[in-house]
Amino acid sequence: MSEQKPSLTYRDAGVDIDAGNDLVNRIKSTAARTRRPEVLGGLGGFGAMVSIPAGYKEPVLVSGTDGVGTKLRLAMQLQKHDSIGIDLVAMCVNDLVVGGAEPLFFLDYYATGKLNVDVAAQVVEGIGQGCEQAGCALVGGETAEMPGMYEGDDYDLAGFCVGIVERDKIIDGSRAQPGDSLLALGSSGPHSNGYSLIRKIIEVSGADLSQSMGDTTLADALMAPTRIYVKNLLKLIREVDVRALSHITGGGLPENIPRVLPKGTIAALDTQSWELPPVFQWLQNAGGVAQEEMYRTFNCGIGMVICVPEDQKALAMDTLNAMGEKVWQIGVMEAAESSDAEPVVRYAPGLLTA
C-alpha cells in the first residue's frame, strides 16, 4: 500500500490568509477617517472608484509613486513603525503639490516575508495619518506576504497617489524668471532621503542613537516624519503667484531645484541664509561629509523651495508664517549667459546680505 502524501496548505508555504484578513479588518476604520465625498464604495473591492470633484472646467489628473528607501531599515532596527507611513504619503503628495495639484486618493503596497499584523497595522495607521494631513483618501492597497523574498517580517513599502489640478492652474516652472525670489520651507529632518549614507555614518562612527540631539534624541531626530506641505501650499497658491515649487528629496538642492526651472536661468542660493539644523551638523561631523556632498544628498533643513515674484515675496512669507511654516528667503533667480543653458544651482554665500 502506497504511503499517503501530506496535504499541504498555503499556511505550510508561509502565507497566512487569515492574518491578511485580520489586517484588512483592523485598517478599515483608518481608511474610513480619510474618506472624501468623491470616493465610491469602501475597501475590499477589486478596484477603487473615485469621481472627479465638482467645479473643475478642465481637470488634469496628476499621478505619482514613491517609497521611503532605507529609512525602513532604521525603523525596523528601532522597532518604530508608527510614523513611517506618514513618510510614505509625504513623499508622494509633496511631489503632486509641486504641480499645483490637490491629492485626491492614495494606495499603498506592503510586501513582507512573514506578515506581522501588529507592525503592518501601525504602518497603515501612519499612512492614514498622512492622508488626513494631505486631505486625500486612502482607497486601497496590497499586502503581499512573500516567504523567501524577504527575511522574516522585514517589509518594504510603496505608495501611489493621484491628484487633480485645473489645466490653467498647473505650476510647471516655465514662468520662473530672473529677479524672482526663492523661499525655503523648513524640513523636520532628513525626511526620507539619504538613509543609506546615514546608516553608514552610524555604523562607522559607532553612534549611540539614544544620545541627545537638541531637545530630542538622535534616533527620534532621524526618524522624524517627513513634513507634508500640501494644505499650506494649496492655500498659498490661492493667495500668491507661485511660479515654481521644488520638493527637496534625493539629490538635494542642486538636483531638485533645476528640475522645475526653465532653460537660461540660475537659482542663486545664499548658503549663509540658514544654519544646518543639529541633526545635519551631526551627520556632517560624524561622517566627515564634504559640504557639496551634504547639499546633493540631504535636504539640509529645506523641504520645499518656492519661486515667487519679488513684489509678492512679503505676502508669501506673511501667508506662510501665519500658517505656522518656518520660511525664509534662500536666494534669487538669475539669468544664465545663454538662453539655451540648462538651469543650474549656484551657491552664493552672502548674496542676500551684500
UniProtKB/Swiss-Prot annotation:
Its main location: cytoplasm. The keyword Hydrolase does not apply. It is found in: Cytoplasm. Its EC number is 6.3.3.1. Pathway: Purine metabolism; IMP biosynthesis via de novo pathway; 5-amino-1-(5-phospho-D-ribosyl)imidazole from N(2)-formyl-N(1)-(5-phospho-D-ribosyl)glycinamide: step 2/2. Pfam families: AIRS (PF00586), AIRS_C (PF02769). GO terms for molecular function: ATP binding; phosphoribosylamine-glycine ligase activity; phosphoribosylformylglycinamidine cyclo-ligase activity. Keywords: ATP-binding, Cytoplasm, Ligase, Nucleotide-binding, Purine biosynthesis. It comes from the Bacteria. One of its GO terms (cellular component) is cytosol. The keyword Nucleotide-binding applies. InterPro entries: PurM-like_C_dom (IPR010918), PurM-like_C_sf (IPR036676), PurM-like_N (IPR016188), PurM-like_N_sf (IPR036921), PurM_cligase (IPR004733). GO terms for biological process: 'de novo' IMP biosynthetic process; adenine biosynthetic process. It catalyses: 2-formamido-N(1)-(5-O-phospho-beta-D-ribosyl)acetamidine + ATP = 5-amino-1-(5-phospho-beta-D-ribosyl)imidazole + ADP + phosphate + H(+). CDD domains: PurM. Belongs to the AIR synthase family. This is Phosphoribosylformylglycinamidine cyclo-ligase. It comes from Marinobacter nauticus (strain ATCC 700491 / DSM 11845 / VT8).
